[in-house]
Amino acid sequence: LKSLLVYLKGYVKESICAPLFKLLEASFELIVPLVIAAIIDKGIANGNTSYILSRCGILVLLAIVGMVAAITAQYFAAKAATGFGRGLRSALYQKIQSLSFNELDNLGTSSLITRMTNDTNTVQNGVNLVLRLLLRSPFIVFGAMIMAFFIDAKCALIFLAAIVLLSIVIFLIMAYTTPGYKKVQSNLDSVTLITRENYEGARVIRAFTDESNEIAEFNRRNRALSNMQKKVGKISSLLNPITYVIINIAIVVLVYSGGVKVNIGDLTQGQVVALYNYMSQILVELIKLANLLVTITKALACADRIKSVFEQESTLDHNDNKANSNSYIEFENVSLKYRNAGDMSLTDINFTVNKGDVIGVIGGTGSGKSSLVSLVPHFYDASNGTVYVNGCDVKSLDDDKLRNKIGFVQQKSVLFKGTVRDNMKWGKKNASDNDIIEALKLAQVYDTIQEKGGLDFFIAQGGANLSGGQKQRLSVARALVRKPEILILDDSSSALDFATEARMRDAIYSLDYNPTVFIVSQRASSVMSADKIIVLDDGKCVGIGTHKELLNSCEVYKEIYVSQFGKEEA
């Protein structure tokens, strides 16, 4: 938690004022038992009504001043905690944005969402309570004990014994609950993951009538979360009753000892009442402190999870490699292995691309097509070898500048909630309506959008109100808006009919700014007219050439072509 407190830096005044005003309130609270003792011993005992009324006035004044101090403390604590939460969330979001695909894959989307929402809220609540109670509760506990020593040292030893016993209990409970809360958060990640997957894949689940299995799996994970929460909760719940038992036993001993001392004249009735009130104050504050420690335990567990994200360093390598390539794009002995993967996804890939070339990438499922094109914008580091873009090692280039030259359309079409215009401006922030319309026409989706309401048509979350083909074409249009130097279409026309795909492909080939195009597909028809076709099989390059050359020289390509067009065509 200490490493995250840097986000309180802008709230130093509030972080100091909140506990100070709480200490002021606590000071007034410690005076109250002495005033009550005086009322009993001097006012009631002597029948002095004016004395009683004056002391009651002091009690009212103490209550009002204490209330004002408490409200002020709450204001400062809330301001500091909410500011801390905002800063923490913002920094965490920026950190996540800076991570490479490797780290994002490793951490998992659901876990990151939980850390951004649930964990940050828990830490924020912990900071709020710490500012209000961490000094106040111990101050009253030890203050009440000191006041008790001033009244009667022997009776005050009862206070000391109770506090020592409770400290031992709190330590033992925290030793168990701290790791327990970490397991709770881990189980919450698991529940969030399956919930997210089920909502996103609801249509697939229903298509395979697999609802009962998914419900059973959700219930299993939910039960694991619930059981862990119960397990930790049972231990945490012991804190309050044990505190009550210890304090109430201490009160019984105190009242008995006080009564004996009153009989022999060592204490007055008012002093016994004052001791009782101090013991009651200790009880209340220890209950608050116990709950605070439970909250702190949760906050520490969540803070560790957040801290682990901040400690993640991007594994993308950057260097000053001055080696150049004579080709616009070149893969030189490139291999790729994903983190925690058993096998290589790509092995010893070599090819060159000239500026303005159209490159087809074809192969079966899992052959490494997407892995290959993801190395061009430096989404991942090659495990071996070098990838050159514009003649330079991608590791020596600024990632943002490199990616601003690339239009990348991924396999899964991702659209954001908002208008068509808003989505298109992801490709180019200052794109005019004419730029957007031109891109929509190139992607063969302009007429469809016009029928739906034009550029102001509102796209639902995840593009739920669009078909798969419409989402794919809008994704292509978004990439075309920026007029990229390199256009990568990663199986981005799989949901299109052949005629629409052919029209879109012809439009891209005829672009006046002549981009270098990578077309990834399992369809031979999508890559037949490319200047160069790269054939992948199990992560290895088994053929490079034109369509005609590969039909004669590459058995894998020929098999793909024959399976789609028939033997006579080949």
Give the positions of each predicted feature.
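Membrane-integrated ABC transporters
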Residues: 1-32, 36, 44-60, 65, ...
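Transmembrane helices of ABC transporter permease
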Residues: 10, 14-27, 59-62, 68, ...
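An intracellular "coupling" helix at the cytosolic face of ABC transporter transmembrane type-1 domains
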Residues: 10-13, 98-102, 118-131, 135, ...
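Helix-loop-helix
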Residues: 47-54, 147-161, 231-304, 309-310
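Pre-NBD coupling/linker segments of ABC/ABC-like ATPases
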Residues: 313-324
